[in-house]
A protein has these predicted regions:
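Acidic, surface-exposed loops and disordered segments
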Residues: 1-316
Length: 316
C-alpha cells in the first residue's frame, strides 16, 4: 500500500482524503471521529440485533428532519425466508442496463453484496411512501372539514404539484435512512446500503401498494471484523486477504464554495483521480475514479421508468 494510505500514520481527517494534507486540529469528539472512519460493512457475524434496539433506531430515524411534517416514508424488515425471495428477484427481475443497450436486462454478479444480504441480522427495504398522504387527499370523510384547503391544492399543475411532493418524499426517506444508519453505527453495528433494490419489481411479492416505491435496501448487523475489504464485487476472497482502508473522498476545494460557485479546478480533479487509481490498484482492481464515473452514470432506461410508473411515481 502506498504510504499515503497508511492509516497508522494518518489522522482520520487525513485518511478520509487519502494523503498527508495539513490536519485540521479543531477539537473533535467520538461521533465525528467515527464518521470520518466509517466504511460499508459486507461481512457480519451471526449475532442478532435485539428487537428493542431496532425500535430505538427507528425512533432515531423518525427524529430526522421531515419536510412540512409529511413523514412520507416507511420500511420493510425482511425475514431470512423473504431475503431468499429477494435473492431470486435479483436474478429474475434485475432492471440494470448495459451501456451497449440501455433496455437490455442484465444479471448482477456481486457475491459480496449477496453474502451480506444472507449474513446480516436485519435487512430493510426503505420505501418512499406517499400512501398515507394519498388517503388524506382522497378520503371523502375529510372533504367537508378541509374543503377550502383541498380546492387550493387542486389549483395549478397537477404534474408539477405531484413531482414536487414526490421529490420531497424521496429526500425525506434518504434523510431518515441515513439517520438510522448513523445511530446504528454509533452503537457498533455495521451498515451497507444496497441500491439494486431500486431496480427490482417487488410490488406483488411484498404487497406494496400504489404510490409506494422501494428506494434502496440496507444490511444491518454486527460486523464480523473491523478490518474487512471495502469491495463486494469480483474475487472477494482475494480482497479479504488485505486490510480495508478508508476510501478517499474528493478534496474539499472541489466541493466547498464561498458566496459563489467556483470554476472546476481540473488539476485537482486529476490529482484525485490519480490518488484513487493508486487506491484501487492496491486491491488489484485496475481502474481509476474516472472509470467509475463513466461506468456508473449511464442514463435511466425505459425499463426503470416503467417500473417507477408501476409503483405510481413520475406518471405525468
Amino acid at each position: 500500500m502506498p504510504k499515503k494510505f497508511n492509516e497508522t500514520t494518518l489522522s482520520k481527517f487525513q485518511a478520509r482524503y487519502g494523503q498527508e494534507i495539513p490536519d485540521n486540529h479543531y477539537p473533535s469528539n467520538q461521533f465525528i471521529e467515527q464518521l470520518l472512519a466509517r466504511k460499508s460493512i459486507r461481512r457480519f457475524n451471526n449475532k442478532k440485533i435485539d428487537p428493542k434496539l431496532i425500535e430505538k433506531l427507528l425512533a432515531a430515524a423518525q427524529s430526522a428532519p421531515t419536510s412540512s411534517m409529511l413523514q412520507p416514508w416507511s420500511v420493510i424488515s425482511l425475514s431470512e425466508e423473504k431475503r431468499r425471495v429477494l435473492h431470486n428477484q435479483r436474478n429474475s427481475h434485475w432492471l440494470g442496463e448495459t451501456k451497449a443497450n440501455p433496455d437490455q436486462i442484465r444479471t448482477p454478479t456481486d457475491p459480496g453484496n449477496l453474502r451480506a444480504l444472507k449474513e446480516c441480522s436485519h435487512f430493510f427495504i426503505w420505501l418512499v411512501d406517499c400512501s398515507i398522504l394519498d388517503y388524506v387527499f382522497s378520503d371523502p370523510s375529510l372533504d367537508k372539514k378541509y374543503k377550502d384547503l383541498k380546492i387550493q391544492r387542486e389549483r395549478g399543475s397537477r404534474a408539477s404539484r405531484e413531482l414536487h411532493y414526490e421529490l420531497r418524499s424521496i429526500i425525506d426517506t434518504v434523510i431518515a435512512a441515513q439517520t438510522f444508519s448513523l445511530a446504528a453505527e454509533s452503537l457498533g453495528l455495521g451498515v451497507m446500503y444496497m441500491g439494486s433494490v431500486r431496480n427490482m419489481d417487488l410490488q406483488e411479492e411484498f404487497s406494496i401498494p400504489n404510490h409506494v416505491m422501494p428506494l434502496f435496501g440496507m444490511c444491518v448487523g454486527y460486523p464480523l471484523s473491523d478490518d474487512l475489504n471495502p469491495f463486494g464485487a469480483g474475487k472477494i476472497d482475494q480482497y479479504e486477504k488485505k486490510p480495508s482502508h478508508i476510501k478517499p473522498r474528493l478534496p474539499q476545494e472541489l466541493i466547498y464554495h464561498q458566496d459563489e460557485y467556483k470554476p472546476l479546478d481540473v488539476e485537482k480533479l486529476h490529482e484525485y483521480n490519480s490518488l484513487m487509481e493508486s487506491f484501487y490498484s492496491y486491491y488489484e482492481l485496475g481502474r481509476d475514479w474516472f472509470y467509475r464515473v463513466i461506468d456508473r452514470t449511464f442514463p435511466l432506461s425505459n425499463s426503470f421508468k416503467k417500473l417507477a410508473a408501476k409503483y405510481g411515481f413520475f406518471t405525468e
